């Protein structure tokens, strides 16, 4: 009984326009950022190295290489109000559910094959 009530409340806050993406895909996430008194959308593009959770608590981690070869990882809640958009740039072909091994790779070794 209580589980049904929780699911009903969660369903109210879940987004409907979330694209289907998987680990290994390159995604572009638009995040709403507040700077002083103005608000803008900041794009963060990278490879999805982890997906976890389900329902309202579903989240994913995106990794990209920033300037000077420094790796940056950000974790986003799929249904968070700050996440403006999720756009799949390219589909990756991987055989793992977690791509933490990419943290130790640089350059061409960190490339992921494209799914056809």
UniProtKB/Swiss-Prot annotation:
Q: Which GO terms describe its cellular component?
A: cytosolic large ribosomal subunit
* GO biological process terms on file: translation
Domain of life per record:
Bacteria
Write the signal peptide boundaries. Answer: none
Single annotated GO MF: structural constituent of ribosome
Per its UniProt record, what PROSITE patterns does this chain match? RIBOSOMAL_L19
InterPro entries this protein is in?
Answer: Ribosomal_bL19, Ribosomal_bL19_CS, Ribosomal_bL19_sf, Translation_prot_SH3-like_sf
* Name the record gives this protein: Large ribosomal subunit protein bL19
What is the species listed in this Swiss-Prot or TrEMBL entry? Roseiflexus sp. (strain RS-1)
């Amino acid at each position: 009984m209580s589980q049904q009530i929780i699911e009903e409340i969660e369903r109210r806050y879940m987004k409907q326009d979330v694209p289907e993406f998987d680990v290994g895909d390159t995604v572009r996430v638009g995040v709403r950022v507040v700077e002083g008194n103005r608000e803008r959308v900041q794009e963060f593009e990278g490879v999805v190295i982890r997906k976890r959770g389900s329902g309202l608590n579903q989240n994913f981690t995106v990794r990209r290489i920033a300037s000077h070869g420094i790796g940056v990882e950000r974790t986003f809640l799929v249904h968070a109000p700050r996440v403006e958009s999720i756009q799949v740039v390219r589909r990756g072909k991987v055989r793992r559910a977690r791509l933490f091994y990419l943290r130790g790779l640089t350059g061409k070794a960190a490339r992921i094959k494209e799914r056809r």
